Amino acid sequence: MPLSRLIINDFRNITTCDIQLSPGFNFVIGPNGSGKTSVLEAIYLLGHGRSFKSSLTGRIIRNDCDELFIHGRFTTPELFELPIGINKQRDGTTEVKIGGESGQKLAQLAKVLPLQLIHPEGFELVTDGPKFRRAFIDWGVFHVEPAFYDAWSRVKRLTKQRNALLKTANSYRELSYWDLELAQLSEKIDQWRVDYINHISEATQQICQAFLPEYDIKLSYYRGWDRETPYAELLKKNFERDKQLGYTVGGPNKADLRIKVAGTPVEDVLSRGQLKLMVCALRLAQGQHLTEATGKQCIYLIDDFASELDSHRRQLLAQYLKQTKAQVFISSITAEQIADMHDDESKMFEIEHGKIAQG
């Protein structure tokens, strides 16, 4: 469902704004420091409960204010409005409302508002550590497998408990009871991840062929331990080593998605502009699979659209985004950079010093 309305209060340099949105393309135009990224950041906060720019709540609440508030409205397929909102206070308190009901969990907010973010720091998905690619995989599994969230939360708790027990256990018998459940859930999570990567690999490669036809890009999934070894067996076999180290070496918390060109990691082959298109291909493939699997559309947030992309590559990306028929929010310094994407159904907003007006 696309957002039909967005209200922002006391977020960053934005005192207040209340805008009606297009179900298609929404452009936020303004000079550096004007607050255009803050609009996208507010939408991200509404769907994730956190900022993609700062982990400190105090830094995203407007100066001299005690709290921020972000409110959104959807128009459902049945044509009734569903309100959602998030309130954050300087003391760290967070309140989430869905359909007017308080006390909702952030995971429920994420289910209602599936978001894909493409921003200048987004190269981390392919260039940095495995945790970013695990988060990428798990975003997709979370949205298509209802049992994933609880299972993964349980695995993380069990692993933490196991690591604590490793410091005091004298024999493996003291861990065997906990390891039984940990192994069963870990194998289940692994299978969900395998299925998910299998589903999006073909779509990713097709989009990469359009964006980067000169490269044959391959995805491969590493589950976090040897493919031939059951996890229960690994936990037992590695007990002495894990005890010596003080933590569990292998497991689903070590999974990774390996992205290569002719056997070489993509970050060693592609330019920054090409890496951005690679990230876009992954995000678009995720959105495509979400729609195919659930009927939902994700919302795309693209900060600094022109960054690292020449006009030809911008046109390619814009073409694919239009084909998705998803709602898209794009920030840009000038209207000229997005002129060929603007149509009768899109909306353009101009922002300066935190004040927003429809262009």
From Swiss-Prot:
Family matches, as Pfam families: SMC_N
Xref: InterPro entries: DNA-binding_RecF, DNA-binding_RecF_CS, P-loop_NTPase, RecF/RecN/SMC_N, RecF_2
Residues annotated to bind ATP: G30, P31, N32, G33, S34, G35, K36, T37
GO MF term set: ATP binding; single-stranded DNA binding
Main location: cytoplasm
SUPFAM superfamilies listed in its UniProt record: P-loop containing nucleoside triphosphate hydrolases
Protein keywords: ATP-binding, Cytoplasm, DNA damage, DNA repair, DNA replication, DNA-binding, Nucleotide-binding, SOS response
Localization of this protein: Cytoplasm
GO BP: any one term: DNA replication
GO cellular component terms listed in the entry, alphabetical order: cytoplasm
Similarity section: Belongs to the RecF family.
Function as written in the Swiss-Prot or TrEMBL entry: The RecF protein is involved in DNA metabolism; it is required for DNA replication and normal SOS inducibility. RecF binds preferentially to single-stranded, linear DNA. It also seems to bind ATP.
PANTHER family: DNA REPLICATION AND REPAIR PROTEIN RECF
NCBIfam families named in the record: recf (TIGR00611)
Protein name (database record): DNA replication and repair protein RecF
Source organism of the structure: Aliivibrio fischeri (strain MJ11) (Vibrio fischeri)
